[in-house]
Amino acid sequence: MALCHEMLPGAKIGPAPNISLVYPASCKPEDVLAAQNYNAIRNWLYLDMAVYGVYNNLVWAYLEENDACPEFGEGDAEALKNGHPDFIGFNYYNTATVEASDGTEKLDPGADQQTARGEAAVYRGYKNPNLPTTEFGWEIDPMGFRATIREMYSRYRLPMVVTENGLGAYDTLTEDGKVHDQYRIEYLRKHIEQIQLAITDGAEMMGYCPWSAIDLISTHEGMVKRYGFIYVDGDEFDLKTLDRYRKDSFYWYKKVISSNGEDLTD
């Protein structure tokens, strides 16, 4: 970041991690500590490094306990300290909920970054009974979006831009070339409403970029997990025509951006 500012004095630069605010499963102090631990590892490790130029203290203590501290070369610490972002970009899909670990958690090779499964002696993943889930098991938490924005702005006091937010689903193309994805419209509407509320809370937002404009290959599920406003006629086993079809959400979001987010109606 320092090099960017040196080479391009008028440029703005910032990190763009994937952030999932972590809730404790209960008000038990042990669960609260577990949530703090996972928040530090899952979220603040990246942003503390980018914004403040130092490792998060909880993560560093964990690394020391496990003899896993990185080695710093000459000038590394200074380079980190001198990198000052102008903004924070972040991806948001859901929150996570955890409880205290009993030390028996095993690494789950099928887990992904959006499903908190557990880490021995650190936290144990907990299914939040208050939240619905997508067809792929990710919890849906629009209000958690607002909570995430509030927490990030309180910690870092930098303007933010949402670099990814969207719903992966099994979309169906009708015989007349339509995709009726009202579920995606509802998902996006509720999340955009929460951004607007976060702005009234005092958070500074630069922009919102939904994921995504067009169906593409998901790293875990391939083409079957669709995010786009535009349907691509093809799947993992058959390229088909690769023709493009505008989904209902395409026309809805066109209206949203033409009104600068003021019109979220159907």
Regions found by a protein language model. Give the residues of each.
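Active-site region of glycoside hydrolase catalytic domains
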Residues: 1-266
